[in-house]
Design a protein with these regions (language model features):
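Terminal-region recognition feature
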Residues: 1-141
Length: 141
């Protein structure tokens, strides 16, 4: 496969994620809530958000970095539009990645939580995911 074909595949996946998210955003608005990306946009300086791991399917969290009043921050917002924002292994992996980057750089983290809890279908792995996230958060406190 060529680089151009690979790029096309990535862009198609990104578009599919945004379209899936749009349906969930409408449901959020009906509930009187803002979507994850909207909450991040309201917090950060305009145009400063750099999303990380966007193509992680069904993670249920939007994560990245940006600035608040010109100061760098890492941020993550659970996305209730994806599996009610429930925490599982994929979501924890994205969050832990952000927390580790913040620890290495001494940069603050803003967490926007909107979740129904753990992904019970993942069983003990979901609880382990929570434990991993909370352990990393405790190290940053």
């Amino acid at each position: 496969m060529s680089t151009l074909q690979d790029l096309s595949k990535v862009l198609s996946r990104k578009q599919a994620i945004l379209e899936e998210s749009a349906a969930g955003v409408e449901q959020q608005k009906k509930s009187g809530k803002q979507a994850a990306r909207e909450r991040i946009a309201l917090l950060l300086d305009g145009g400063s958000f750099v999303e990380q791991s966007m193509l992680a399917q069904d993670a249920g969290v939007v994560a990245g970095s940006g600035t608040v009043d010109g100061r760098p921050v890492y941020v993550f917002a659970q996305d209730f539009a994806v599996m009610d924002g429930a925490m599982g292994a994929k979501q924890a992996k994205k969050i832990v990645k952000i927390l580790e980057q913040a620890r290495k750089t001494g940069t603050p983290v803003v967490a926007m939580c909107d979740s129904n809890g753990a992904r019970v279908g993942e069983g003990a792995a979901a609880l382990e995911a929570y434990a991993d996230v909370f352990a990393h958060m405790a190290r940053l406190s």
